[in-house]
Amino acid sequence: MTKKNQRTVFWAVLLTVSLCAGCCGTKTPPASATATENAKCVRKTIYDYTLTTGKGGKLNLADYKGKVILIVNTATGCGFTPQYAPIEKMYRDYHARGLEILDIPCNQFGGQAPGTDDEIHDFCTLHFNTTFPQMKKADVNGPNELPLYTWLKSQKGFQGFDEHKYKSRLEAMFAKADPDWAKKPDIKWNFTKFVIDRKGNVAARFEPTADMAKIEECIKSLL
């Protein structure tokens, strides 16, 4: 077996294990935004929000006006973690044309991002040579979710998983925890992506099951 095939098998096994862990040991995170919070979101734009970087600095999204932005919640121990590679490639290919990528580690899904911010950064640079900005680990669902995510979810809710070999397994896992899971805008799993256009609108939401080529085409159309 070649090294490439070994890596493919490794990540496939990891995703299977992580989904099993989700079924056995995790619950669907609580509903995200109240009606009042959603009403507040309507009056805001993405440029009203700030984030904390992995090193503790402040990042004003207003500084990204006129850019196309890909925002993704990530984890280092997930079967979707190899998506770091095509995400980094997109950053290198399109950053000069106006693409920005914001990586927001999150430990809410199967506990798959347990490391410190420094450990997560070291993992990503060592295994995937990432160069795009990485934020401080944060929640994307529930009472402690980032205000940015309350806004993002108010703009684009969940529309279903894409055709994928793990689609039925994901759906069964969430249905077991909450029969109404598909009606809620919450982030469902690691590597959910939001694409922001140059005017600050949420152009698209992609679930982790989405083909990376489809995401790249969306980004290219906005540059």
Give residue spans per PLM region:
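Thiol/selenol-based redox catalytic cores and closely related redox-interacting motifs
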Residues: 129-209
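C-terminal motif of bacterial Sec signal peptides marking the signal peptidase cleavage site
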Residues: 20-23
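Conserved helix-turn-beta segment immediately C-terminal to the redox Cys motif
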Residues: 67-68, 76-77, 81-106, 124-128
